[in-house]
């Protein structure tokens, strides 16, 4: 099968955008980073580089910029005595933060298109027989769907604060949803997978009875049920996993070019170009003709017709497989 390589991170221009970002980025690193495993997916690779350990932000920055530029960048929710050990038992687990993952595409039905990047035809299979290349898929992420994900995050925060007395932090994932994280120490950090499963099922509303006739302002599930909240849509496997990798706050998501960003005020969050660090303009060459919503804007593309567009939008479109960024214009 032919290989079509000018997409997702294989462009040298996209790499230069990412490298310039990481030269000065203030990554949100834990204060015990020497106990965390770091991992990344480099440009041009489908596999992860794991079992990395760093003792300072400067050491990490040097590695990212000069050795392995990341398309995706993570650290472990777990703390380890030897985070760089390749054997998981040898790492010696010391406890983990508590994680929740909300994917907007699990909440909404999103429009998706599979197409050939050479001829531009819509194709349902993974290969275009005519051009002998792999097809690409584009999934449209709408602001309305992101809003629904944000509402799930709001409900989750309420449960964790009111019912468990925890102090969760909410992060935009950089692509299609939200991560909710509780920095855990002591007993919280030592919760095993079964105990975390109980928490996951609780916030999802598993086994919670109905409370007909209750007050909407009542505390706990009585009030939630009477406000129409039956549970939070999370990926339970993320919460159960005590050795999960977390996207590093203020890193870039390799499928969008957007920043993994803490949302300190849920009421102020907007899914728009402000989530991108990139300025100036790009020349973008579309693979297909399409009208689509991009970061809360309606964008019209014509196959093979280059357009000058904001870098935030052009890089997003490139990483979403809709075409190529051909040039940067200040």
Swiss-Prot record:
Its EC number is 2.7.7.-. GO terms for biological process: DNA replication, synthesis of primer. One of its GO terms (cellular component) is DNA-directed RNA polymerase complex. Its cofactor is Mg(2+); Mn(2+). GO terms for molecular function: DNA-directed RNA polymerase activity; metal ion binding. Zn(2+) binds at residues 116, 119, 128, 131. The keyword Metal-binding applies. Pfam families: DNA_primase_S, PriS_C. Heterodimer of a small subunit (PriS) and a large subunit (PriL). HAMAP family: DNA_primase_sml_arc. Belongs to the eukaryotic-type primase small subunit family. PANTHER family: DNA PRIMASE SMALL SUBUNIT. This is DNA primase small subunit PriS. It comes from Saccharolobus islandicus (strain L.S.2.15 / Lassen #1) (Sulfolobus islandicus).
